[in-house]
């Protein structure tokens, strides 16, 4: 079957090649410049088989050659072999401007999101209407217990139950079918996994039980008495259908789990107060008789009932202590136990308030995520603008429109008006996801080459083949009207129509410079939006930021202290005990740095003295030894002539390095 259908497809594409080559004469030359298959697949000039020409086939210049009659001889450099059909889903490509196909999985996903993940006003209207219907059915069930409205409510309830059973049964089947869009619910076992969810089990029980009650418990159009009781219970279960996501129970469970320690403590102490107060009241009142001659606290169970009614502040008044001892015990334990039994309500209330505030803060934080993503994207685009890679500039190149005339041998002019009406629709997205709509990507246009510029302008051809959306870098031509006026023809000849750039190789330096400027502007705008989104939510956030900053500062100070200890040593290493006892304030960092500077200054002075001494020894060695005996003293002098009398070198001291290394002179040499 595939082999039989391939020849017509090849002939159709070859016919399209012939019309394409007749309208664009520069395709072969551009194809030689872009021989790579990747560039041809990206929508280059050589890969324009699936796109419409800029001018229609009929609008050719007088000097241009006529299209070839037979498409069997393609130009050199272009291989026209049979090409397999492209089976890619356009929803997968980010550069696709077509709307997603209504496939089976796509419909399943939309239905699943509508029923299981309601968002938007349509979902709200649907689920709120279901809630009102279930509530109305419950109201009629209540009215059926009143004798005045029993006849009317029972008949109406019968038909409402039939409608609800059919509706909920159909909805259950649709939910089961739409769950196949998720990977974990695919197939029979996946559907069973979906049916094992608690809310799905409740829906199935309600539907099946309602069908059984309608089939067995009805007599004509009226329910039996036993069936009415079953219907009431099922209507109560239907109220669980309203909250299918279980958000209420999850919220309650999270609050209880967070404050579980406080709740357990208060309930434990309150329970201890309850049993102790009930026991002591029972001991005091077990023999007391009331006015009617009856013992009210005849058992410990009666005392426990009185304790529960008292500590929960209900106070039925059916059992009252009679003796003063019992009243005193009851009053003391009531004040103590009631305070603990009232604490869980306050704990849960504060927990719900904190949970709501946490959700609001999370929403405020979630607003920063798109702003941060936009800032990162624009910063990366500014960095990538210096890269000559073709993928950097691909988003600014317009993909030519798919030609409708290439797919059929005989074009139908009736559809051109429909294409002209719908041409603005796909360009709204421009192949960019909805999250990137904040960053507008302009398309670039350029002047047409001289060899491809026709003598007579065909405005309709441009209008039908090129989709125009005015952007920052594009000048959209105004709508021209052909008339018989010679002056208007002269005005029309002076106009220049801009053709969209369809390949990266057509970009010039001024295009790239303009793109860099636009990207830099988008970066500054995204930075400003991110700074606005980073504003604190309330005063607590400001205090938290300050405390976090203070904590970071203290950590850095401790790290600096540790490095100073490693560099200049700890105070206990070079400070004597006497100084520690005199002044403990000298252990500060400033005092330690001053001591280090003093030590460095002393070392510098000693090095100067040693240097002067070496110079003196060198001069003595070159000038000869001193005459006379006695102790030999070396007085190293500085540049200003100051003598350091603290350094003496007696003759009977140990020999120096110079004395050991320099050879001694003989007596004849000395004379």
From Swiss-Prot:
- Glycosylation annotated at which residues? 290
Report biased composition (Basic and acidic residues) as residue ranges: 449-458
Which Pfam family, an example, fits this chain?
A: Ion_trans
Classify the source by domain of life: Eukaryota
Chain intervals with Pro residues compositional bias = 64-74
Q: Where is the composition biased (Polar residues)?
A: 650-662
Q: Where is this region: Interaction with KCNE1 C-terminus?
A: 536-573
Q: Where is the composition biased (Basic residues)?
A: 412-425
Q: Which PANTHER family match?
A: POTASSIUM VOLTAGE-GATED CHANNEL SUBFAMILY KQT MEMBER 1 (PTHR47735:SF14), POTASSIUM VOLTAGE-GATED CHANNEL SUBFAMILY KQT MEMBER 4 (PTHR47735)
Please describe the quaternary structure of this protein. Answer: Tetramer. Heterotetramer with KCNE1; targets to the membrane raft. Interacts (via C-terminus) with CALM; forms a heterooctameric structure (with 4:4 KCNQ1:CALM stoichiometry) in a calcium-independent manner. Interacts with AKAP9; targets protein kinase A (PKA) catalytic and regulatory subunits and protein phosphatase 1 (PP1) to the KCNQ1-KCNE1 complex, allowing PKA-mediated phosphorylation and increase of delayed rectifier potassium channel activity.
Q: Could you say which protein family the record assigns here?
A: Belongs to the potassium channel family. KQT (TC 1.A.1.15) subfamily. Kv7.1/KCNQ1 sub-subfamily.
Question: Could you identify this protein by its name?
Answer: Potassium voltage-gated channel subfamily KQT member 1
| Species in which this protein is naturally found | Cavia porcellus (Guinea pig)
Q: In the record, what lineage is assigned to the organism producing the protein?
A: Eukaryota, Metazoa, Chordata, Craniata, Vertebrata
